[in-house]
């Protein structure tokens, strides 16, 4: 999976897909009451990027629904995964449950259209900290209460704050989540980061019977040397400001026979068995 990073303006969706991304990440900004308002990162952000692009969240969902719906004029077959980077760190942790309710309802109304949409992308909920786990509880409660619990099959969980992996496991255990879990490891493209935690996540992913990590990705990679390093370690995905660079690296002799771009037929919740 090649995730286009910080795709917050509607016009950026095609831009990143044209560069080779098959997944996009966008930031969701909330008001003080936990209501999702806009797709927006804000300052500071990655080096060399404009941090202020944005869209109204519901309008963004309406557009991305079309982009991921077969036979729609806007349909782009390659886009199979949407990563929602939830800016919960900007609101009170007491509002995390309200935020989870709101995002679930907006996805129901504007993306899935309560069963009337054929939009098919998988959804990854990127949570900044284990302290915000009530968002996940609320999201799942809302799908159940609204009568659309089946959409849980399309939704995965990912904690992005580089926290202790055992602490993340404990929170997932509290929530009763034993599947559909991704694990991110990374840092803004402005800085270098070692591989110790990334290696630990990959080791846990590959441990038989360990159900708290199905996929691992590294972020935000812009240098080809770091992309190569991550691929050699065996990541499932790369988040990048430059998907075209990832494409070029994947075509190199070292990687061409080992990796390919994920398609809709690849289940993002299953561990890869090479």
Curated annotation (Swiss-Prot):
Catalytic residues in the record: 5, 41
Gene Ontology MF term list: lyase activity; metal ion binding; phosphoric diester hydrolase activity; toxin activity
EC number: 4.6.1.-
Cystine pairs: 45-51, 47-190
GO CC entries: extracellular region
Enzyme class: lyase
Subcellular location: Secreted
Keyword set includes Disulfide bond: yes
Expression across tissues: Expressed by the venom gland.
Reaction catalyzed: an N-(acyl)-sphingosylphosphocholine = an N-(acyl)-sphingosyl-1,3-cyclic phosphate + choline; an N-(acyl)-sphingosylphosphoethanolamine = an N-(acyl)-sphingosyl-1,3-cyclic phosphate + ethanolamine; a 1-acyl-sn-glycero-3-phosphocholine = a 1-acyl-sn-glycero-2,3-cyclic phosphate + choline; a 1-acyl-sn-glycero-3-phosphoethanolamine = a 1-acyl-sn-glycero-2,3-cyclic phosphate + ethanolamine
Required co-factors: Mg(2+)
Organism domain of life: Eukaryota
Amino acids binding Mg(2+): 25, 27, 85
GO biological process terms on file: killing of cells of another organism; lipid catabolic process
Cofactor note: Binds 1 Mg(2+) ion per subunit.
Keywords, ordered alphabetically: Cytolysis, Dermonecrotic toxin, Disulfide bond, Hemolysis, Lipid degradation, Lipid metabolism, Lyase, Magnesium, Metal-binding, Secreted, Toxin
Family: Belongs to the arthropod phospholipase D family. Class II subfamily.
Function of the protein: Dermonecrotic toxins cleave the phosphodiester linkage between the phosphate and headgroup of certain phospholipids (sphingolipid and lysolipid substrates), forming an alcohol (often choline) and a cyclic phosphate. This toxin acts on sphingomyelin (SM). It may also act on ceramide phosphoethanolamine (CPE), lysophosphatidylcholine (LPC) and lysophosphatidylethanolamine (LPE), but not on lysophosphatidylserine (LPS), and lysophosphatidylglycerol (LPG). It acts by transphosphatidylation, releasing exclusively cyclic phosphate products as second products.
Name this polypeptide is given: Dermonecrotic toxin SdSicTox-betaIIB1bii
